[in-house]
């Protein structure tokens, strides 16, 4: 078993553009022209190939590119008892584009069961070697909590949970169980992807909650509570990190706003080992909130964008790293893209060649800064 621990000086979030043969196989499966077994064979081949490419690129963390899921978050939720989903033709409005998502809601109490993602991890783990370690990405507990209390789901959720605190308790316990399942399968590096903090930054979110008669500080407290509850009893030798961004769908974003208003919660109090933070443009604000990061955490600066094909200016990125250094020591900093390349199957509006060029730039800059 590899003993390497994330994050690394140059790192990435997790998802990669789906190769054409995988897209074709999934389409054929949906049309009924190939079997699940045939789709699994193609998926296994594509995962094997993407891992090999990560190694060739010189990266130490390896992921399965999230090739086995449609959405970065919803598919994982479907692996719990009490959760169902359906294609309802709905979606979530991003900046200039409607994200085509599947309705995901409760049909009972949330409970853990043998989670299919653990088997997905086992397939990935076989590729570990002395230079690499398998990292698995799942949505944060707060993301699942938020999914069940959105306006279109809250009435259904109240059939099973009279209060948010009861829902938080069950989600936290279910995650504790699944984390132990990952650990038993040999996972020592788990990443919790979390858009909930990014969704409540800025004045727009504050005004939205005020109009609903909800104290936004109570919202922040609940997000922190469910995330930390899930981490209670975690194995001591398991690294658990959190990636925070403001939405990433087909090169569009969901929200904008600086981290200032949530730093006292997630930066200071969330019990993770590192934070992978979106910082690729002005929407994320400045680096001053990094001063609130507790001393036991590392920070991975997401300064390279996956939303646009153009390569960043190396000197400007290096300058931004040193700007961040004013608030947190350089030895606790790392570098990565701001998010994945394909948070959902549709992927961002870049090519595979541009994807690898972005990662080559991340590595080049990191090796120069932390030489």
Language-model features: where?
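Domain-level signal for soluble alpha/beta catalytic cores
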Residues: 1-371
């Amino acid at each position: 078993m590899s003993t390497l621990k994330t994050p690394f000086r140059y790192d990435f979030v997790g998802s990669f553009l789906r190769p054409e043969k995988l897209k074709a196989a999934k389409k054929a499966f949906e049309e009924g022209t190939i079997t699940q077994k045939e789709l699994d064979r193609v998926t296994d081949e594509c995962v094997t190939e993407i891992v090999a490419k990560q190694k060739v690129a010189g990266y130490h963390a390896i992921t399965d590119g999230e090739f086995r899921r449609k959405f970065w978050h919803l598919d994982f939720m479907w692996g719990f008892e009490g959760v169902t989903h359906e294609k309802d033709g709905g979606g979530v409005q991003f900046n200039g584009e409607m994200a085509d998502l599947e309705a995901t809601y409760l049909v009972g109490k949330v409970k853990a069961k043998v989670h299919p993602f653990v088997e997905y991890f086992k397939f990935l783990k076989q590729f570990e070697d002395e230079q690499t370690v398998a990292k698995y990405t799942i949505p944060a507990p707060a993301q699942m909590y938020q999914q069940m209390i959105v306006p279109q789901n809250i009435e259904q959720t109240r059939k099973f949970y009279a209060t948010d605190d009861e829902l938080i308790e069950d989600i936290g316990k279910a995650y504790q169980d699944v984390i132990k399942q990952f650990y038993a399968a040999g996972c020592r590096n788990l990443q919790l992807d979390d858009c909930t903090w990014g969704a409540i930054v800025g004045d727009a979110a504050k005004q939205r909650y005020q109009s609903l008669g909800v104290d936004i500080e109570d919202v922040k407290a609940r997000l922190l509570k469910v995330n930390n509850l899930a981490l209670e009893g975690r194995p001591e030798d398991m690294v658990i990190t959190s990636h925070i961004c403001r939405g990433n769908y087909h090169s569009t974003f969901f929200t904008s706003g600086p981290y200032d208003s949530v730093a006292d919660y997630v930066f200071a109090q969330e019990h993770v080992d590192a934070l992978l933070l979106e910082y690729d443009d002005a929407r994320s604000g400045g680096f001053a909130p990094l001063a609130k990061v507790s001393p036991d955490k590392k920070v991975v600066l997401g300064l390279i964008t996956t939303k646009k094909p153009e390569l960043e200016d190396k000197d400007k990125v290096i300058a931004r790293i040193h700007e961040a250094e004013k608030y947190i020591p350089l030895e606790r900093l790392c570098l990565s893209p701001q998010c994945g390349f394909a948070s959902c199957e549709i992927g961002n509006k870049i090519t595979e060649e541009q994807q690898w060029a972005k990662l080559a730039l991340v590595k080049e800059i990191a090796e120069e800064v932390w030489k």
